[in-house]
């Protein structure tokens, strides 16, 4: 059987944790930042976990993670 290709965009965006979950970066922190409060931007800096409903899609994109 041929090897399964990894989706390279997903490989750059998600990191697998030891417990089997996936870490991801928060969105909305690239541009148009002046209208966002300091508190909102500070909270967006932290990593978040991929939701359980989306985890199936991430696993399909990263077969060797």
Curated annotation (Swiss-Prot):
Enumerate composition-biased segments (Basic residues).
Answer: 10-26
Write one Gene Ontology MF term. Answer: structural constituent of ribosome
| Biological process, per Gene Ontology | translation
Q: Which UniProt keywords apply?
A: Ribonucleoprotein, Ribosomal protein
Write out the ranges of the annotated region (Disordered): 1-26
Any one Gene Ontology cellular component term annotated for this protein? cytosolic large ribosomal subunit
Q: Name one Pfam family in it.
A: Ribosomal_L35p
Top-rank taxon, per record: Bacteria
Name the InterPro entries on file: Ribosomal_bL35, Ribosomal_bL35-like, Ribosomal_bL35_CS, Ribosomal_bL35_sf
Transferase keyword on record: no
Q: Which family does it belong to?
A: Belongs to the bacterial ribosomal protein bL35 family.
Q: Which NCBIfam families match?
A: rpmI_bact (TIGR00001)
Q: Which HAMAP family match?
A: Ribosomal_bL35
Tell me what this protein is called: Large ribosomal subunit protein bL35
Please report the organism this UniProt entry assigns to the protein. Answer: Pasteurella multocida (strain Pm70)
Q: What lineage does the source organism belong to?
A: Bacteria, Pseudomonadati, Pseudomonadota, Gammaproteobacteria, Pasteurellales
């Amino acid at each position: 059987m041929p090897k399964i290709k990894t989706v390279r965009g997903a490989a750059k965006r998600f990191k697998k944790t030891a417990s089997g979950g996936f870490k991801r970066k928060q969105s909305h922190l690239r541009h148009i930042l002046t209208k966002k409060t300091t508190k909102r931007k500070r909270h967006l800096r932290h990593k978040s976990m991929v939701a359980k409903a989306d985890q199936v899609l991430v696993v399909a994109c990263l077969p060797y993670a």
